[in-house]
Amino acid sequence: MKAHEILDSFHSLLEDVRRGLFITIDSEGYPQARWMVAASLNEQPDYIYSVSFDSSNKIRDLATNNKVAWSFQLPSLNEIVYIQGEASVLDNPQLKAEVIEALGPNLAHFWRVRPEHGQLVVIETAIEKIRLQQPLANANSAGKL
């Protein structure tokens, strides 16, 4: 399977699950994982978008190391996508509006759990490596973008 085919499979999976495990490296060099709502934008298929507050730990992590990983899976575990890339923290009002619209009602839990005040920012992950694992079919595919 070619990289663009894996990316197509990922976009289909993301439409279904809308959430992924986002992994950063903290200032002490340890991985930090947290579940996040994520989306892609049609005009930027090689990127993953999410939002956070500028005061969050993940934003501090990205300030010292922008290398990240994502993991997405179907509840049945018959498709799992692993992504590696570089993340940027962006404070662009137009992009923020597009991302919030793409994330839509999936942010309801985010607003309840994170009532803190702060500036909402976009986390944009440029996908560099992608791997699709299909355990039930005993299949693995990987590609670089």
Predicted feature locations:
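A short, Trp-centered hydrophobic/proline-enriched beta-strand micro-motif
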Residues: S12-S27, V68-F72
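Onset of an N-terminal alpha helix
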Residues: A3-H11, E15
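Charged, gly/pro-rich active-site loop segments
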Residues: K2, Y82-L145
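A short mixed-secondary-structure module that forms the rim of ligand-binding clefts
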Residues: A39-L77
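Short, surface-exposed beta-edge/turn micro-motifs
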Residues: V17-R19, D46-I48, N65-V68, H117-L120, ...
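Short, positively charged
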Residues: M1-E5, R60-D61
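Hydrophobic/aromatic beta-strand elements that line small-molecule binding cavities or substrate pockets
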Residues: M36-S40, G85-A87
